[in-house]
Amino acid sequence: MATADEHLGYPYRASGEARTRARPETVWRVVSSIGGENRYFTLNALWTVREAMDALIGGEGLVRRRPEGGTLRPGDRIDSWTVLVADAPRRLALLFGMKAPGRGVLEFVIAREGDTTVVSATAYWRPKGLAGVLYWRAMEPAHLFLFRMLTREICRRAERLEAEWAAARVRAAQPASGPGPRLSLAARRLP
């Protein structure tokens, strides 16, 4: 098993980031729900192709799983990934579990900057030989595109979640019988 921060020294990385007005705790809720039946939020066809390739060579790429309960812990398995770091609401690092010529980690970092929250997704890669370097070079453009799309979608989902919560609070604050009829001044009877 890799150590929690070992990947920070890996020589190759690709990342994307996005900003949202959603709170870090809400962004974490979205990020930490990744995998399993939830899939990967965007461009799932690309993830599925890579998973199928892994399955063809005997890997666990097509396995769908998430830990029971809502709290992630180091060692938990999410599909073929292993949780290295689960530091709510700031950081989630996942060890790449598919067959590949090297070792990889996907890390999400959530940080508050002023009145916005920044979420980044970064792939770290330590190649094993020339095959690992070539693998990275082939995958890097897709990673750059994918992580920009992924972080934007995470932000969109977090904003939608907060909007749904706000709407539920408004509904809960209304009287049980609902608001009465609203009449314009012209429709009211004047004495």
Please tell me what each predicted stretch does:
Residues M98-L144:
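Beta-strand/loop substructures that line and gate deep hydrophobic ligand-binding cavities in soluble
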Residues R21-E25, V85-P89, V109-V118:
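A short, structured loop/turn motif at beta-sheet edges
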